[in-house]
C-alpha cells in the first residue's frame, strides 16, 4: 500500500530513494510552472491506481511516499488551463518505461489527445522504478586521446542480427553486440570507439505504425534517461546495457551514445501527448509569434533548451548516463538546437557552458551534428572548442573528387589536411573535425559507388524522402551487376572496389578524427536506400554473408598505419615542416596545378617518410617520385614500382614509405 510519508523535496527531479528510520522512502519531483495541481499516480501489482496530491515549491511539485519498490509503475496527472488530468503523463526523468503506445489509427491516437476526455491509464506508457545496482568491478574508461580516436558508427540490432557467429538468441541485443566474437572483430579492425545509434527509449511515429513500419534508427525519443528495452536479451535492460559497456571497456573500446535533445516524440501540437507537452508545453517547446511550434528539426517540434528547466534536464541526463552507465561520450543529433537561445544560434549559449562546467563531463567526448533545418541552422565550425563536429564538407568534397569529374583537387586537399578553413580558430585542434564519407543517414560506401539515384521506395513515400544529391557514381550500371556478362561485370566490380578503397584510405589517412560507418569496411549494402530510418529488416542489417575480405584487410591495414604516422596522431595542424604537396612529376604543386579542373592526381609526403599516391581518374597514372628508395605499404593492388617511378594502373590510393 502506498502512503504519503511527508511533503518530500523539490530535488532531485524524477524519483530518488533513501532509507529513513528503517523505512524505504521514495521522493518524486516534477517541474511544471503551468500546473495548478499535480497528482502522483502509483500502480500496484494488481494494476490498481493510487492518486496522491503533490506539494508545490515554486515550480516544482514533490512528494515522499512509502510502499514503492522495484517494479512499481508511476505517472502523473496534471491539472491546469491547458492540461487534462484524464491523461497519464510520463516523467521526463523516467529511468524505465513500461509500454509503447499504439498510434496506428485515428482511433488509437485519439486516446492520447489532450482534447479527448476519456481516461487513458490503461493505454499510456508509465515510468517504472528500477534497481540501479551493478557490480562494475574495476571498470575504467579507456580514455583514448582524441588524436588517437577512430569512431565506428553502428546500430545495436543491425550489427549482429545476421551474424551467424553469434548465438541466435543474442543477435540484435546489447549482449550480442558485446559478444567476444564482435569485440575481437572490432579490436582486429582497430577502431577505438563505437558510436551507438539512439539507445534511449523511443517510439514509432503514427505514420510509420499506420504503414506497418518502425523507426529503426531510434531518433524519436520519449524517455531520454531510459534504456531502450527492445535491444535487451534479458528482463533487465539497464544491467544488460551496463554489462555491454563494461565488456567494451575491457576490450579498450569507448562507448559513445547518439542522443536526441532537439525534439521529442510528441511531434506537432495536435498530435498525441505523452510527457513534456502535458506537463508544461510553454516551457519545454519553442513557439513562434502566432503560438505555433517552431519546427526546425523536421520532426514536428523543437525543444527549448534555453530555459533553466530545459538545460537542467539535458545536463542531468548526460550526468546520469556517465555516472550510471560509464558512457565515454555523446554525439548530439541536430546539435544547433542546443545553442538556440533566442531562438537563434549562439556559440556561447548557456547550455554549452553548463555542459562544460559539469564535473562528471570533464573527460567526456562531445560530438555535434552542427546543423538543423532552421534559421542559420548550418553551423559547421562554429561550436565551442570542446566539441568535435561532423564535417559534411569533408564528405561532399571527397565524394566529388573521387566520383565526379567536376571534383576539385584543392577542395580535396583542404579537407584531407583537416579543414583548417573551418576549424582552425578559437584555439581549436584538428581532432575537432570529425571526418566521414558515409553515416547512417545516406548511402553506405558500397552504395555510393553503385547507385546514381536513391531507391527509397520501400519507405512508403514514393521515393521523395532522403537526400537527392549524394555525389555518387554507379560506374556504368545501377545497383547489382548480376545482369552483366563478362568481362563487363568484373570491370564494373573492380572499378567500384578501387573507388571504395580510395575513399576509405582518404578518410582514414586524413588529418582529423575519422568516423567509419559499420559495414563499410567489408562492402555492406542497403540496396540504394539512403534514408533507411524505417527499415528494421535485411535492408539495414549488416550482411556478414557477403563479407569482402580484401576491403576489410585494406581498412584494417590503413588504420594500423595511421597509428604510426606522427602527423595523424599528434593533433597538430599540418605545415610545410610535415607535409609536402607534389604533382605527378614530383614537383611542388603550383597555383595552376591547384586550379586545374582536370587535375585528379597528386602526391603527398607526410613526416618526410610517408608517400601517398592519389589518383582519382578512371584511367591509370604515372608518378615521378621524390628521389628516395620507396617501399610499398598498402593500396598496392594496382601499382607498379620501378626506380623513381610508380604507375597506378587505375583509380587508386597507394601508400609507400622511405626505406
From Swiss-Prot:
Molecular function via GO: glycogen debranching enzyme activity; hydrolase activity, hydrolyzing O-glycosyl compounds
Q: What is its EC number?
A: 3.2.1.-
Keywords attached to this entry: Glycogen biosynthesis, Glycosidase, Hydrolase
Task: Kindly identify the residues recorded as the active site.
Answer: 333, 369
Q: What class of enzyme is it?
A: hydrolase
- Regions of biased composition (Basic and acidic residues) lie at 456-468
Q: Site feature Transition state stabilizer: at which residues? A: 441
Instruction: List the SMART domains.
Output: Aamy
Start and end residues of each stretch annotated as Disordered = 456-486
Q: InterPro entries under this entry? A: GlgX_C, GlgX_Isoamylase_N_E_set, Glyco_hydro_13_cat_dom, Glyco_hydro_13_N, Glyco_hydro_b, Glycogen_debranch_GlgX, Glycoside_hydrolase_SF, Ig-like_fold
GO BP annotations of the record are: glycogen biosynthetic process; glycogen catabolic process
Superkingdom, natural source: Bacteria
Family recorded in the similarity comment: Belongs to the glycosyl hydrolase 13 family.
Protein name (database record):
Glycogen operon protein GlgX homolog
Species of provenance: Haemophilus influenzae (strain ATCC 51907 / DSM 11121 / KW20 / Rd)
| The gene coding this protein | glgX
Amino acid at each position: 500500500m502506498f502512503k504519503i510519508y511527508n511533503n518530500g523535496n523539490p530535488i532531485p527531479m524524477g524519483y530518488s530513494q533513501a532509507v529513513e528510520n528503517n523505512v524505504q522512502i521514495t521522493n518524486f519531483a516534477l517541474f511544471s510552472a503551468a500546473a495548478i495541481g499535480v497528482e502522483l499516480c502509483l500502480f500496484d501489482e494488481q494494476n490498481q491506481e493510487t492518486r496522491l496530491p503533490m506539494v508545490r515549491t515554486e515550480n516544482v511539485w514533490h512528494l515522499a511516499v512509502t510502499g514503492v519498490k522495484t517494479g512499481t509503475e508511476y505517472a502523473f496527472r496534471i491539472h491546469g488551463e491547458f492540461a487534462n488530468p484524464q491523461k497519464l503523463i510520463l516523467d521526463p526523468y523516467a529511468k524505465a518505461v513500461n509500454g509503447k503506445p499504439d498510434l496506428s489509427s485515428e482511433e488509437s491516437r485519439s486516446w492520447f489527445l489532450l482534447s479527448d476526455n476519456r481516461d487513458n491509464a490503461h493505454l499510456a506508457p508509465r515510468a517504472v522504478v528500477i534497481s540501479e545496482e551493478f557490480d562494475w568491478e574495476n571498470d575504467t574508461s579507456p580514455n583514448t586521446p582524441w588524436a588517437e580516436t577512430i569512431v565506428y558508427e553502428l546500430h545495436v540490432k543491425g550489427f549482429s542480427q545476421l551474424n551467424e557467429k553469434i548465438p541466435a538468441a543474442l543477435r540484435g541485443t546489447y549482449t550480442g553486440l558485446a559478444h567476444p566474437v564482435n569485440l575481437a572483430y572490432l579490436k582486429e579492425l582497430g577502431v577505438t570507439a563505437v558510436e551507438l545509434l539512439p539507445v534511449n527509449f523511443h517510439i514509432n511515429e503514427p505514420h510509420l505504425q499506420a504503414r506497418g513500419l518502425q523507426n529503426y534508427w531510434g531518433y524519436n525519443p520519449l524517455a531520454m534517461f531510459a534504456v531502450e528495452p527492445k535491444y535487451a536479451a534479458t528482463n533487465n535492460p539497464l544491467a544488460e546495457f551496463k554489462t555491454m559497456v563494461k565488456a567494451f571497456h575491457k576490450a579498450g573500446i569507448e562507448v559513445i551514445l547518439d542522443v536526441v535533445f532537439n525534439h521529442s516524440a510528441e511531434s506537432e501540437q495536435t498530435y498525441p501527448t505523452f510527457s513534456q507537452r502535458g506537463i508544461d508545453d510553454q516551457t519545454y517547446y519553442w513557439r513562434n509569434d502566432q503560438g505555433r511550434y517552431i519546427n526546425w528539426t523536421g520532426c514536428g517540434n523543437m525543444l527549448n533548451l534555453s530555459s533553466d528547466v530545459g538545460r537542467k534536464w539535458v545536463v542531468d541526463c548526460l550526468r546520469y548516463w556517465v555516472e550510471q552507465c560509464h558512457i565515454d561520450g555523446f554525439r548530439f543529433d541536430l546539435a544547433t538546437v542546443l545553442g538556440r537561445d533566442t531562438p537563434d544560434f549562439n556559440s556561447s549559449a548557456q547550455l554549452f557552458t553548463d555542459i562544460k562546467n559539469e564535473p562528471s563531463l570533464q573527460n567526456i567526448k562531445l560530438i555535434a551534428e552542427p546543423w538543423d533545418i532552421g534559421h542559420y541552422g548550418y553551423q559547421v565550425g562554429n561550436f565551442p572548442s570542446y566539441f568535435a563536429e561532423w564535417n559534411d564538407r569533408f564528405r561532399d568534397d571527397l565524394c566529388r573528387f573521387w566520383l565526379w569529374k567536376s571534383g576539385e583537387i584543392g577542395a580535396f586537399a583542404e579537407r584531407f589536411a583537416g579543414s583548417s578553413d573551418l576549424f582552425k580558430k578559437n584555439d581549436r585542434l584538428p581532432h575537432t573535425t570529425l571526418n566521414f564519407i558515409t553515416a547512417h543517414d545516406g548511402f553506405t560506401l558500397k552504395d555510393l559507388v553503385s547507385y546514381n539515384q536513391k531507391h527509397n521506395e520501400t519507405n512508403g513515400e514514393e521515393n521523395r524522402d532522403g537526400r537527392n544529391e549524394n555525389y555518387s557514381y554507379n560506374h556504368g550500371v545501377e545497383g547489382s551487376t548480376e545482369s552483366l556478362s563478362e568481362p563487363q561485370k568484373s570491370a564494373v566490380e573492380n572499378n567500384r572496389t578501387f573507388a571504395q578503397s580510395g575513399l576509405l584510405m582518404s578518410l582514414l589517412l586524413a588529418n582529423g578524427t575519422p568516423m567509419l560507418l559499420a559495414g563499410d569496411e567489408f562492402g555492406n549494402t542497403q540496396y540504394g536506400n539512403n534514408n533507411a530510418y524505417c527499415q528494421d529488416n535485411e535492408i539495414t542489417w549488416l550482411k556478414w554473408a557477403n563479407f569482402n575480405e580484401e576491403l576489410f584487410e585494406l581498412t584494417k591495414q590503413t588504420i594500423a598505419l595511421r597509428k604510426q604516422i606522427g602527423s595523424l596522431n599528434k593533433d597538430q595542424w599540418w605545415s610545410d615542416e610535415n607535409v609536402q604537396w607534389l604533382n605527378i612529376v614530383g614537383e611542388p604543386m603550383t597555383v595552376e596545378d591547384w586550379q586545374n579542373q582536370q587535375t585528379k592526381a597528386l602526391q603527398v609526403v607526410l613526416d618526410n617518410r610517408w608517400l601517398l599516391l592519389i589518383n582519382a581518374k578512371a584511367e591509370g597514372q604515372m608518378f615521378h617520385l621524390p628521389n628516395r628508395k620507396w617501399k610499398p605499404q598498402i593500396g598496392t593492388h594496382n601499382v607498379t614500382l620501378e626506380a623513381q617511378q610508380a604507375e597506378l594502373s587505375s583509380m587508386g590510393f597507394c601508400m609507400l614509405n622511405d626505406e
